[in-house]
Amino acid sequence: MIEVQTTSQLQEQLQDAREQGKTIGFVPTMGALHGGHQSLVRACAQTCDLVVVSIYVNPLQFGPHEDYHEYPRQLEKDRVLAEEAGCDVLFCPTDEEIYPDGYTQTVHVKQGANVLCGKSRPGHFDGVATVVLKLFMLVQPDFAFFGEKDAQQVAIIKQLVKEFFLPVTIVACPTVREDDGLAKSSRNANLTPAERQVAPKLYAALRDAAKSPTSQLSDLVQQVRQHLAALPLGCIDYVEAYEYPSLKKVEQSDGIVILALAYQFSKARLIDHILIDMNNRNGGLNDVSDNDESKIASCTGD
């Protein structure tokens, strides 16, 4: 594995691969890597000749009172985990490399940006779309791999690629979970031991609601809220349901629905969701445990 910090160093590493006709795969991250990130890198390595992983904590997607400075940074450990999973080129740029002239040009996202996480985080997805577009322009990958855990982000990035005619295939891979159902997340490190015991109940609430026979999205939301209201720690940020991937608000649906939540613990805001086929109410479409990475092979690209 080769580590680079500057865009010129990155281009030097990519030039040979392009000249040799190799397929380039890309996994953008904010670091604090875990098993979920590694599953994306492995899926990328199975598909592509050259695997590029970026580690960059993007300040533009954090609000003024959010956890930018508290976001975990562990570059030494990240290097080991990235290489172990199959990374060939690790790109760790500075703010000056990504925003050499400051925030003079940014992407403004309209569709799907003001619901779910975007409702309480104005400008968040503008920051996400801006940095992803910049990284795509730098790496120019054939494939880019994202986790379905951030389903809203995946939907927005797919639309970004479509709107800007970017020649990259977006591959969405199932959420990787701990054995108790908690979605793997860098923010889990900020949970207290007591909060860590409570956190798996978030996904349990979503799964219970997904099996409900109701066709009303508002009923699904209410069921989840009732489960969460009984938890001894933390508080609800939101529980919402939308058509997916359009993220349009509807009362009923006979297609795919995203039932999503955000929950605030003392120093960690966790998100989770489940995708529900409203014609098949036996549970969600996006379950994968940490010891079942074979399902990663079913990642789908658009």
Curated annotation (Swiss-Prot):
Keywords assigned by UniProt?
ATP-binding, Cytoplasm, Ligase, Nucleotide-binding, Pantothenate biosynthesis
Specify which residues bind (R)-pantoate according to the UniProt entry for this protein: 61, 153
Q: Cite the record's note on assembly.
A: Homodimer.
- Compartments, record wording: Cytoplasm
State the NCBIfam families in the record.
panC (TIGR00018)
Q: What remark does the entry add?
A: The reaction proceeds by a bi uni uni bi ping pong mechanism.
Top-level taxon of the source organism:
Bacteria
What is the main EC category here? ligase
List the active site. Answer: 37 (proton donor)
The EC code for this enzyme is 6.3.2.1
Query: Its biological function?
Result: Catalyzes the condensation of pantoate with beta-alanine in an ATP-dependent reaction via a pantoyl-adenylate intermediate.
Q: Which Gene3D superfamilies match?
A: HUPs (3.40.50.620), Pantoate-beta-alanine ligase, C-terminal domain (3.30.1300.10)
> What name goes with this protein?
Pantothenate synthetase
The residues that hold beta-alanine are 61
An example Gene Ontology molecular-function term? ATP binding
Database matches in InterPro entries: Pantoate_ligase, Pantoate_ligase_C, Rossmann-like_a/b/a_fold
**Its family?**
Belongs to the pantothenate synthetase family.
Asked if the Swiss-Prot or TrEMBL record annotates the protein with the keyword Transport, the reply is: no
